[in-house]
Design a protein with these regions (language model features):
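Mid-length scaffold segments of soluble, non-membrane domains
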Residues: 79-140
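Primarily secretory-pathway and cell-envelope proteins
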Residues: 1-85, 139-193
Length: 193
């Protein structure tokens, strides 16, 4: 026999249109995942026994949305991130990076493993920090678990980038992690050992 839902249960439901429910559930800072090599997921589907990638980053991509991205304390409203304060390099969950082999960044060896990656931005430089305090929503930093802090210069972009973006690019020594948002761009060189 087929179990039917009684009519009185159907009338107790709150009517919500599909459009409204989609709008309510859309994350304004969608999560993204990048790999090095860049096309690793496609390669893995074509070659199941392919070796692990070198690196993977999981992060959320906030948008400017008519706000000021970076500012000092003199700007009082509509600021996403203050200069000199810890930033999770995205939104929502802490940005997570995984190295599948040892790499060297600015002369510092980083062992294979998963880390959160955060930033302390300034107008002319970003300090990128790797930390072992995984699984934190937002950015609840235990600075005793910082394993490396690397200073990289800010390059001014001619084009404004609406969504915070990270991508890997091949280089002669390994790869560069390019991070861009608004008119700011940074490049973190990663050497393969």
């Amino acid at each position: 026999p087929v179990n039917e839902v009684p009519d009185n249960l159907n009338t107790m439901r709150i009517p919500v249109s599909v459009k409204d429910s989609l709008i309510l559930s859309i994350d304004k800072s969608p999560m993204d995942m990048i790999y090095f090599p860049e096309d690793y997921p496609k390669q893995k589907m074509l070659t199941p026994n392919l070796a692990n990638p070198v690196a993977r980053i999981i992060y959320s991509r906030p948008q400017i949305n008519k706000r000021i991205i970076f500012a000092d304390s003199s700007v009082l409203q509509n600021v996403i991130q203050r200069y000199g304060q810890d930033w999770r390099l995205g939104a929502n969950e802490a940005t997570e990076i995984e190295f599948f082999k040892q790499v060297t960044i600015n002369g510092r060896k980083i062992a294979p493993g998963r880390y959160i990656m955060y930033c302390i931005p300034y107008p002319d430089k970003w300090n990128i920090v790797f930390n072992e305090n995984l699984y934190s929503w937002g950015l609840h930093i235990d600075k005793t678990k910082d394993i490396a802090e690397i200073e990289i210069p800010v390059i001014k972009n001619d084009v404004e980038i609406e969504y915070f973006t990270m991508l890997f690019q091949s280089s002669i020594y390994g790869c560069d992690l390019v991070m861009a948002w608004g008119n700011a761009k940074t490049v973190l060189p990663i050497h393969f050992n």
